[in-house]
A protein has these predicted regions:
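Protein kinase-like catalytic domain
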Residues: 26-30, 165-168, 191
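Hydrophobic alpha-helical segments that form the core
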Residues: 179-187
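ATP-binding pocket architecture of kinase catalytic cores
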Residues: 1-65
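Active-site Asp-x-Gly
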Residues: 63-65, 77, 107-113, 120-176, ...
Length: 214
């Protein structure tokens, strides 16, 4: 029998505790970048329950290679095939994937155990604290979960981050890398909804693709 949870308004102390618990979850680790939960076979799913998109799972030795090959490139191709981007625009995602694959944006930290779809709608605030729902769990970079919390406006986000950093300090430059860590989610939304999400994803490439890069 499942326990019924009742929502309450979020508070700063609850947000800080969410940050601490999330950091501990990340520190529990995973066997490799891109690996699914223990016992899971095949790929996963990401996006709205009404039309989930495939989420590639596997094993990668570095975060940059994993994120380029299993997240950015497949979704950019999907967006192109859906008519969201033309060939020239898709090339910009290829360039950012190439930069990721070099390991330039890796931070040298251990693989984190991610929720994987940690936007604000998947945080339920209850009397017992925050409860995370609807995971797309896999091994990844801890900054990805934090970037998704920021993407759609999580309540008391500053307190979440403060609590997180009590347990796990963040590497220099983490704020600048947020857009890259949001890119997969933005591309999913671009495929499903188009519109402003497609533009937001393109803005990330303008920040991270060097002028004249091929």
């Amino acid at each position: 029998m499942l326990e019924r949870l009742h929502s309450v308004p979020p508070t700063a102390p609850a947000a800080a505790e969410l940050g601490r618990r999330l950091a501990r979850t990340h520190l529990a680790g995973a066997a490799a970048y891109g690996v699914g939960p223990e016992g899971w076979e095949g790929d996963g799913f990401f996006g709205p329950l009404s039309a989930p998109l495939p989420m590639v799972l596997g094993e990668w030795a570095s975060w940059g290679a994993f994120y380029a090959e299993a997240r950015v490139t497949p979704l950019a191709r999907m967006a192109r095939d859906a008519g969201v981007y033309d060939a020239a625009e898709t090339t910009r995602f290829d360039r950012i994937a190439a930069r990721l694959a070099t390991g330039e944006l890796d931070t040298g930290e251990p693989v984190a155990r991610l929720h994987g779809d940690l936007w604000s709608g998947n945080v339920m605030w209850t009397e017992g604290g925050a409860v995370l729902v609807d995971p797309a769990a896999h091994g990844g970079h801890h900054e990805t979960d934090l970037a998704l919390l920021a993407l759609f406006g999580t309540p008391h986000l500053a307190h979440v981050l403060d609590g997180y950093k009590e347990v796990h300090p963040l590497a220099d430059g983490w704020r600048e890398r947020q857009g890259v860590h949001q890119l997969h989610c933005l591309l999913v939304h671009a495929v499903v909804y188009g519109g402003g999400y497609a533009q937001q994803a393109m803005e990330v490439t303008r920040r991270w693709v060097r002028p004249g890069a091929h």
